[in-house]
Amino acid sequence: MREILHIQGGQCGNQIGAKFWEVICDEHGIDHTGKYSGDSDLQLERINVYYNEASGGRYVPRAVLMDLEPGTMDSVRSGPYGQIFRPDNFVFGQSGAGNNWAKGHYTEGAELIDSVLDVVRKEAENCDCLQGFQVCHSLGGGTGSGMGTLLISKIREEYPDRMMLTFSVFPSPKVSDTVVEPYNATLSVHQLVENADECMVLDNEALYDICFRTLKLATPTFGDLNHLISATMSGVTCCLRFPGQLNSDLRKLAVNLIPFPRLHFFMVGFAPLTSRGSQQYRALTVPELTQQMWDAKNMMCAADPRHGRYLTASAMFRGKMSTKEVDEQMLNVQNKNSSYFVEWIPNNVKSSVCDIPPIGLKMASTFIGNSTSIQEMFRRVSEQFTAMFRRKAFLHWYTGEGMDEMEFTEAESNMNDLVAEYQQYQDATAEEEDYEEEEEDEEVAA
């Protein structure tokens, strides 16, 4: 019941995805052959959200892995949980997208997309009542961004009423892999605004900062970064996989978090984040979790929530705790920081409680916020985009694959509209008089 189909694309998506499955397998007591070796019935109760039970009692992830080159997938296959995936669900090309969105979306990716869709269809038919899809990808490269968004739009056509959740790694301001990241990201956001229901926004720089500042890691690796992401991903979906007092699913999440359809880009955070050495010295209490969870340093994307206002937010607590205390703490945060919440959506913070904590912790919490400050990130990418596009730098790589300059202009203006929309709601107040005055002004202007 209520299955989620997981799709990972490109190098980044496959690496995050592989880590995510390690965490999920751990939580459900599944070893790397797919056999159950856990000790609690709760692990099996709703295991079919992410796993399909095959013959001989093996649990197979409902995962589709795609890439335009075989490299990353080979390393997933030879990784610790590589043998658990269905071999047919690895779909890869040979040519690579070369960090080019157009290759992923129009040429190389378009050739491979039908075989990916076949696998998606097969997995969807295996579901009792498919709830939705979750896609892991990055927006800076070619495959995850170009082919990822192509797949999302195709799935949208075929399954229009299912939820589409993405975990999208945005290019970060200082840590850049390729010079054309702003192009790829802007073209992708253009697609995500229209075709995705909820986007969890991640970025490497914020993750580096967390590893460096909070976790005190001297040289954080991508493995450490992906571990943070997978903890969050596991937290977002724990309500679906374990029983709890206040449950939520992808659709409830969307209903509570999205006041306007285009504004579905969320900041995520996770608590407790403690460095490995100091873990045992900290007593975890609900107030502590709540405090750390709302801390700007905990956000996994490079935007500061104190520069904007929260439209809505949702918190998922895990572990044995009192629901009453959770509610009190959440109210407490809202009352103390009321200026950071828009006053025209009362009770805009939702919490859910799930009884089973992550491995190795007594309690934990995952935070998802819809904050207007995320426009900082779009603004930054947009500025970099405009700087290059004004000079038509690197454009021939894209036009050579059959793209039109018009498409760039459209993507650019869509991104700018999105920023303007966030700004509009950040400035909006609850007083009626303002609206009447505004309307009069508009009439005069007209």
Curated annotation (Swiss-Prot):
Q: Which GO terms describe its biological process?
A: microtubule cytoskeleton organization; mitotic cell cycle
Q: Where is the composition biased (Acidic residues)?
A: 429-446
Q: Which CDD domains match?
A: beta_tubulin
Q: Which cofactor does it need?
A: Mg(2+)
The protein's predominant localisation is cytoplasm
Which positions bind Mg(2+)?
A: E69
Q: What induces it, per record?
A: Down-regulated by abscisic acid (ABA).
Q: Which PROSITE patterns match?
A: TUBULIN, TUBULIN_B_AUTOREG
Q: Which UniProt keywords apply?
A: Cytoplasm, Cytoskeleton, GTP-binding, Magnesium, Metal-binding, Microtubule, Nucleotide-binding
Q: State where GTP binds.
A: Q11, E69, S138, G142, T143, G144, N204, N226
Region described as Disordered? 421-446
Instruction: Provide the Gene Ontology terms for cellular component.
Output: cytoplasm; microtubule
Please indicate which superkingdom the organism of origin belongs to: Eukaryota
InterPro entries attached to this UniProt entry: Beta-tubulin_BS, Beta_tubulin, Tub_FtsZ_C, Tubulin, Tubulin/FtsZ-like_C, Tubulin/FtsZ_2-layer-sand-dom, Tubulin/FtsZ_GTPase_sf, Tubulin_C
Compartments (UniProt record):
Cytoplasm, Cytoskeleton
Entry coiled-coil feature ranges: none
- Is the keyword Nucleotide-binding in the record? yes
Q: SUPFAM superfamilies given for it?
A: Tubulin C-terminal domain-like, Tubulin nucleotide-binding domain-like
Name of one Pfam family that matches = Tubulin_C
Q: Where, by tissue, is this protein expressed?
A: Expressed in roots, second node, leaf sheaths, and suspension cultured cells.
Q: What family does the entry list?
A: Belongs to the tubulin family.
- Role noted for this protein: Tubulin is the major constituent of microtubules, a cylinder consisting of laterally associated linear protofilaments composed of alpha- and beta-tubulin heterodimers. Microtubules grow by the addition of GTP-tubulin dimers to the microtubule end, where a stabilizing cap forms. Below the cap, tubulin dimers are in GDP-bound state, owing to GTPase activity of alpha-tubulin.
Could you describe the subunit structure of this protein? Dimer of alpha and beta chains. A typical microtubule is a hollow water-filled tube with an outer diameter of 25 nm and an inner diameter of 15 nM. Alpha-beta heterodimers associate head-to-tail to form protofilaments running lengthwise along the microtubule wall with the beta-tubulin subunit facing the microtubule plus end conferring a structural polarity. Microtubules usually have 13 protofilaments but different protofilament numbers can be found in some organisms and specialized cells.
Tell me what this protein is called: Tubulin beta-3 chain
Q: What species was this sequence derived from?
A: Oryza sativa subsp. japonica (Rice)
Q: What are the top taxonomic ranks of the organism? A: Eukaryota, Viridiplantae, Streptophyta, Embryophyta, Tracheophyta
